[in-house]
Amino acid sequence: MFSRAGVAGLSAWTLQPQWIQVRNMATLKDITRRLKSIKNIQKITKSMKMVAAAKYARAERELKPARIYGLGSLALYEKADIKGPEDKKKHLLIGVSSDRGLCGAIHSSIAKQMKSEVATLTAAGKEVMLVGIGDKIRGILYRTHSDQFLVAFKEVGRKPPTFGDASVIALELLNSGYEFDEGSIIFNKFRSVISYKTEEKPIFSLNTVASADSMSIYDDIDADVLQNYQEYNLANIIYYSLKESTTSEQSARMTAMDNASKNASEMIDKLTLTFNRTRQAVITKELIEIISGAAALD
């Protein structure tokens, strides 16, 4: 006679192949579900890459004339050798980003540069105020530098920037009531499709430009003309930085989505191989059970 323990062990041994089969079927369902999800994600990343490529082509075309005007405006400060007075302490720091992500380290590189500049200027005894162009830079810096934010601009990056947008930003800065002595604008300069560089360019207030020693040689420039030119110059530099940042962002997003699509393809290949191996194991096991059962009947 069989003992209860022996019968229990026999029952467990008999049911074990069924449990293995159920587990393998569950694994196949999980793999199928993951494959479907990754394929859907790959469709999205490929579509985003195509959209970014179209926007990048337009941004690169519009960057060339904007770069000429921007570098021309910055040339005034270089050729006139305008420098901020040492005894003045008010410094304005402008960071250019956008409202959209999925573009690599575009926004974090700007935030990193701004944090470094804030630390350096604060250690030198300067009063630093921040301006964020784009919601991403505000989101990164606001938690640690909320008391230093002068103004933040949203709705940036959804459409190609225009000179009108830059003029609105420049006018808002001039009407903010903060009379800075000198400042800097930090943005990503476009270099190639796969490369960009975080750059910092100087900006100066009207009083700083008017009181510069090199400006005294221009006797025929009155205050109104200089003020109008300085306002236009500020808008021009902001427009130039927006165009550089937009082109860098679209190229970085195109590269990021291309890498994401390639990674999705690799995952699909690996999961497909795993699915085929698991399915083959299930089929082989079922054949073994059928053959074993037929042999037992004989």
Swiss-Prot record:
Tell me the InterPro entries matching this sequence.
ATP_synth_F1_ATPase_gsu, ATP_synth_F1_gsu, ATP_synth_F1_gsu_CS
What superkingdom heads the lineage?
Eukaryota
Show the transit peptide stretch: 1-25
In the bilayer, the protein is annotated as:
Peripheral membrane protein
Instruction: State the UniProt keywords alphabetically.
Output: Acetylation, ATP synthesis, CF(1), Hydrogen ion transport, Ion transport, Membrane, Mitochondrion, Mitochondrion inner membrane, Phosphoprotein, Transit peptide, Transport
Assembly with partners or alone: Component of the ATP synthase complex composed at least of ATP5F1A/subunit alpha, ATP5F1B/subunit beta, ATP5MC1/subunit c (homooctomer), MT-ATP6/subunit a, MT-ATP8/subunit 8, ATP5ME/subunit e, ATP5MF/subunit f, ATP5MG/subunit g, ATP5MK/subunit k, ATP5MJ/subunit j, ATP5F1C/subunit gamma, ATP5F1D/subunit delta, ATP5F1E/subunit epsilon, ATP5PF/subunit F6, ATP5PB/subunit b, ATP5PD/subunit d, ATP5PO/subunit OSCP.
What protein does this entry describe?
Answer: ATP synthase F(1) complex subunit gamma, mitochondrial
Which organism encodes this protein?
Answer: Homo sapiens (Human)
